[in-house]
Amino acid sequence: MVSVRKRKMARSSVRKNTRRLKDRQAKINIHSNPIIAANWDKSLTLQQNYKRLGLRAKLGTMVGGQEKPVIKASQKQEEQHVPVSEIENTTDPSKIPEGEARLIRDPETNEVTQVIYGTMKKKSTEDTPEVSTVVKQLEETAQKNAKIKKERKPSEQESQWLQKLYEKYGDDYEKMKWDKKLNVYQQSAGDLRRRITQWKKLNLIV
Protein backbone atom coordinates (compact mmCIF):
# COMPACT_ATOMS: atom_id res chain seq x y z
CA MET A 1 0.00 0.00 0.00
CA VAL A 2 1.32 3.46 -1.00
CA SER A 3 1.86 5.90 1.86
CA VAL A 4 0.09 9.26 2.10
CA ARG A 5 3.38 11.07 1.58
CA LYS A 6 4.09 9.19 -1.67
CA ARG A 7 0.61 9.98 -3.01
CA LYS A 8 1.09 13.69 -2.23
CA MET A 9 4.46 13.69 -3.99
CA ALA A 10 2.91 12.04 -7.06
CA ARG A 11 0.20 14.73 -7.23
CA SER A 12 2.63 17.61 -6.62
CA SER A 13 3.35 19.99 -9.50
CA VAL A 14 6.96 20.32 -8.33
CA ARG A 15 9.20 18.09 -10.39
CA LYS A 16 11.59 15.85 -8.54
CA ASN A 17 15.29 16.56 -9.00
CA THR A 18 16.33 14.12 -11.68
CA ARG A 19 19.85 13.34 -12.81
CA ARG A 20 21.23 16.31 -14.70
CA LEU A 21 23.68 16.13 -17.54
CA LYS A 22 26.79 18.26 -17.39
CA ASP A 23 26.57 21.33 -19.58
CA ARG A 24 28.34 20.63 -22.81
CA GLN A 25 31.24 22.85 -23.74
CA ALA A 26 30.58 25.41 -26.43
CA LYS A 27 31.69 24.12 -29.80
CA ILE A 28 34.67 25.99 -31.19
CA ASN A 29 34.68 26.73 -34.90
CA ILE A 30 38.23 25.84 -35.95
CA HIS A 31 37.38 25.04 -39.56
CA SER A 32 37.28 28.73 -40.51
CA ASN A 33 41.08 28.65 -40.56
CA PRO A 34 42.60 25.59 -42.31
CA ILE A 35 46.04 26.06 -40.68
CA ILE A 36 44.62 25.98 -37.14
CA ALA A 37 42.22 23.15 -38.04
CA ALA A 38 45.13 21.00 -39.31
CA ASN A 39 47.09 21.48 -36.05
CA TRP A 40 44.18 21.34 -33.57
CA ASP A 41 44.17 18.66 -30.87
CA LYS A 42 40.58 17.82 -29.89
CA SER A 43 41.68 16.19 -26.63
CA LEU A 44 42.97 19.55 -25.32
CA THR A 45 41.08 22.64 -24.17
CA LEU A 46 41.00 25.90 -26.13
CA GLN A 47 43.67 27.53 -23.94
CA GLN A 48 45.90 24.44 -24.08
CA ASN A 49 45.62 24.30 -27.88
CA TYR A 50 46.38 28.00 -28.26
CA LYS A 51 49.42 27.72 -25.97
CA ARG A 52 50.69 24.68 -27.89
CA LEU A 53 50.31 26.54 -31.21
CA GLY A 54 52.04 29.65 -29.85
CA LEU A 55 48.85 31.75 -29.77
CA ARG A 56 46.87 33.56 -27.08
CA ALA A 57 43.23 32.92 -26.27
CA LYS A 58 42.82 36.49 -24.95
CA LEU A 59 44.72 39.66 -25.87
CA GLY A 60 44.36 41.19 -22.41
CA THR A 61 45.90 40.01 -19.15
CA MET A 62 44.55 36.66 -18.01
CA VAL A 63 42.87 36.69 -14.59
CA GLY A 64 42.85 33.22 -13.06
CA GLY A 65 42.29 29.93 -14.83
CA GLN A 66 45.90 29.68 -15.97
CA GLU A 67 47.86 26.47 -15.73
CA LYS A 68 51.33 26.90 -14.29
CA PRO A 69 54.08 25.02 -16.14
CA VAL A 70 55.38 21.96 -14.30
CA ILE A 71 59.03 22.54 -13.39
CA LYS A 72 61.04 19.88 -11.56
CA ALA A 73 62.89 20.96 -8.41
CA SER A 74 66.21 19.75 -9.84
CA GLN A 75 65.66 21.79 -13.02
CA LYS A 76 64.77 24.88 -10.98
CA GLN A 77 67.93 24.51 -8.85
CA GLU A 78 70.11 24.09 -11.94
CA GLU A 79 68.71 27.25 -13.54
CA GLN A 80 69.13 29.34 -10.37
CA HIS A 81 72.46 27.86 -9.19
CA VAL A 82 75.64 29.92 -9.63
CA PRO A 83 78.96 28.04 -9.19
CA VAL A 84 81.02 29.08 -6.14
CA SER A 85 84.10 29.54 -8.35
CA GLU A 86 82.36 32.45 -10.10
CA ILE A 87 81.69 34.44 -6.93
CA GLU A 88 84.45 33.45 -4.47
CA ASN A 89 86.88 36.10 -5.77
CA THR A 90 84.44 38.84 -6.80
CA THR A 91 83.52 41.97 -4.89
CA ASP A 92 80.86 43.05 -7.39
CA PRO A 93 77.34 42.67 -5.84
CA SER A 94 75.78 42.41 -9.32
CA LYS A 95 77.64 39.11 -9.89
CA ILE A 96 76.36 37.53 -6.66
CA PRO A 97 72.79 36.10 -6.74
CA GLU A 98 70.14 38.02 -4.82
CA GLY A 99 69.53 36.43 -1.42
CA GLU A 100 73.16 35.30 -1.10
CA ALA A 101 76.24 37.06 0.23
CA ARG A 102 80.03 36.76 0.17
CA LEU A 103 81.93 36.92 3.43
CA ILE A 104 85.44 38.37 3.37
CA ARG A 105 87.54 37.22 6.33
CA ASP A 106 90.79 38.41 7.83
CA PRO A 107 93.48 35.87 6.83
CA GLU A 108 95.11 36.05 10.27
CA THR A 109 92.17 36.17 12.69
CA ASN A 110 89.59 34.54 10.38
CA GLU A 111 87.08 37.19 11.45
CA VAL A 112 84.49 38.53 9.00
CA THR A 113 85.63 41.96 7.91
CA GLN A 114 83.14 42.60 5.08
CA VAL A 115 79.80 41.22 3.89
CA ILE A 116 78.88 41.75 0.22
CA TYR A 117 75.18 41.16 -0.42
CA GLY A 118 74.23 39.96 -3.89
CA THR A 119 71.96 42.02 -6.15
CA MET A 120 71.92 39.77 -9.24
CA LYS A 121 68.35 38.85 -10.14
CA LYS A 122 67.61 35.17 -10.62
CA LYS A 123 66.82 34.02 -14.12
CA SER A 124 63.18 33.34 -14.85
CA THR A 125 62.38 29.64 -15.18
CA GLU A 126 60.07 30.46 -18.08
CA ASP A 127 62.05 31.07 -21.26
CA THR A 128 60.70 33.36 -23.94
CA PRO A 129 58.74 31.07 -26.25
CA GLU A 130 59.99 30.79 -29.81
CA VAL A 131 57.71 31.62 -32.70
CA SER A 132 56.00 28.35 -33.65
CA THR A 133 55.68 27.06 -37.22
CA VAL A 134 51.90 27.60 -37.00
CA VAL A 135 52.38 31.30 -36.18
CA LYS A 136 54.83 31.64 -39.10
CA GLN A 137 52.30 30.02 -41.47
CA LEU A 138 49.53 32.33 -40.23
CA GLU A 139 51.76 35.40 -40.70
CA GLU A 140 52.69 34.32 -44.25
CA THR A 141 49.01 33.77 -45.13
CA ALA A 142 48.07 37.18 -43.67
CA GLN A 143 50.79 38.91 -45.73
CA LYS A 144 49.65 37.20 -48.95
CA ASN A 145 46.00 38.13 -48.36
CA ALA A 146 46.96 41.72 -47.51
CA LYS A 147 48.56 42.15 -50.94
CA ILE A 148 45.44 40.90 -52.74
CA LYS A 149 43.00 43.81 -52.87
CA LYS A 150 39.53 42.77 -53.95
CA GLU A 151 37.50 45.38 -55.79
CA ARG A 152 33.84 45.66 -54.97
CA LYS A 153 31.62 44.92 -57.96
CA PRO A 154 28.18 46.54 -58.16
CA SER A 155 25.15 44.27 -58.40
CA GLU A 156 23.00 44.13 -61.55
CA GLN A 157 20.35 46.34 -59.95
CA GLU A 158 22.96 48.89 -58.86
CA SER A 159 24.52 48.87 -62.35
CA GLN A 160 21.13 49.70 -63.90
CA TRP A 161 20.63 52.51 -61.39
CA LEU A 162 24.10 53.99 -62.12
CA GLN A 163 23.48 53.70 -65.85
CA LYS A 164 20.27 55.74 -65.54
CA LEU A 165 22.07 58.43 -63.56
CA TYR A 166 24.96 58.57 -66.03
CA GLU A 167 22.67 58.71 -69.08
CA LYS A 168 20.69 61.57 -67.53
CA TYR A 169 23.47 63.69 -65.99
CA GLY A 170 26.76 62.47 -67.46
CA ASP A 171 29.56 63.51 -65.08
CA ASP A 172 27.55 66.21 -63.28
CA TYR A 173 27.47 64.62 -59.82
CA GLU A 174 26.12 67.74 -58.10
CA LYS A 175 22.88 67.51 -60.11
CA MET A 176 22.75 63.74 -59.53
CA LYS A 177 22.65 64.09 -55.77
CA TRP A 178 19.61 66.41 -55.92
CA ASP A 179 17.55 63.99 -58.03
CA LYS A 180 14.98 62.73 -55.51
CA LYS A 181 13.53 60.13 -57.87
CA LEU A 182 16.76 58.41 -58.94
CA ASN A 183 18.90 59.22 -55.89
CA VAL A 184 16.35 57.93 -53.38
CA TYR A 185 18.90 57.22 -50.63
CA GLN A 186 20.47 60.70 -51.01
CA GLN A 187 23.99 59.53 -51.82
CA SER A 188 26.57 62.32 -51.72
CA ALA A 189 28.28 63.67 -54.86
CA GLY A 190 31.58 62.08 -53.81
CA ASP A 191 29.98 58.67 -53.29
CA LEU A 192 28.18 58.85 -56.65
CA ARG A 193 31.45 59.84 -58.35
CA ARG A 194 33.24 56.82 -56.86
CA ARG A 195 30.45 54.40 -57.83
CA ILE A 196 30.09 55.68 -61.40
CA THR A 197 33.88 55.78 -61.94
CA GLN A 198 34.04 52.11 -60.96
CA TRP A 199 30.96 51.29 -63.08
CA LYS A 200 32.52 53.05 -66.12
CA LYS A 201 35.76 51.13 -65.61
CA LEU A 202 33.93 47.78 -65.55
CA ASN A 203 31.89 48.69 -68.64
CA LEU A 204 34.92 50.11 -70.51
CA ILE A 205 33.40 53.60 -70.75
CA VAL A 206 35.97 56.35 -71.19
UniProtKB/Swiss-Prot annotation:
It is found in: Nucleus, Nucleolus. Signal peptide: none annotated. It comes from the Eukaryota. It holds the Pfam family Nop16. Keywords: Nucleus, Ribonucleoprotein, Ribosome biogenesis, rRNA processing. Residues 1-20, 69-97 are annotated as: Disordered. Coiled coil: none annotated. Disulfide bonds: none annotated. Its main location: nucleus. InterPro entries: Ribosome_biogenesis_Nop16. GO terms for cellular component: nucleolus; preribosome, large subunit precursor. GO terms for biological process: ribosomal large subunit biogenesis; rRNA processing. Belongs to the NOP16 family. Component of the pre-66S ribosomal particle. Involved in the biogenesis of the 60S ribosomal subunit. This is Nucleolar protein 16. It comes from Meyerozyma guilliermondii (strain ATCC 6260 / CBS 566 / DSM 6381 / JCM 1539 / NBRC 10279 / NRRL Y-324). The gene is NOP16.
